[in-house]
Amino acid sequence: MYSFNASHSGSLDFGVMLAGGTYRLCWCSGMTMTGCAPADFQTDVGELTILGPFERQDRTCIAGVSCSVDAFDGLGLDLGHDRFMILSTCGVPGGSGGFGFGIRLGDVVTWESLSAPGGEYRLCWCYVFPNITFNASGGSSLSPGNESLPDCTVATDFLVDVGRLLL
């Protein structure tokens, strides 16, 4: 949902974390008695490209040993900034998941040891943003950190569900 304030700046909230891909942006005027139901978004206003892994990329590993799986397909994936975590539910701490970070080296993602019991888990992704800030003149500069961006160190940072891991 897009909303704006008196200074004409705005934000766009999709309500869900989208997987990598290209999406159509559609508009509804909101001039109906019911507001904007999904079927009312009939006007195509452009394209939105989300960088990240594609959905439904399932993998299998053996419990108790190092796990290496083929790297994930997606748009704009970055060897130096992609992080993967195995969780019971993406973005939710606790439960029986949470195996630390998968390290992407070239065409594989590796976890040192998977000691959880056999079962089905979720492969979750987070992108570590470089410490860059942008200013109004169009330039950029390095910054000591940005509190609004995830640092991909805790389960709640890993919101994008890439697929399932059978262990």
Where is each model-derived feature located?
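Aromatic sugar-binding surface patches on proteins
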Residues: 1-13, 97-112
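Surface-exposed, short loops/turns at beta-strand junctions within beta-sandwich domains
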Residues: 15-22, 113-120
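Hydrophobic beta-strand core residues of beta-sandwich domains
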Residues: 17, 61-64, 103, 115
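Intrinsic low-complexity tandem-repeat regions in disordered proteins
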Residues: 14, 45, 120-121, 162
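Beta-strand/beta-sandwich contexts
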Residues: 34-94, 132-167
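Extracellular recognition modules
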Residues: 24-28, 122-126
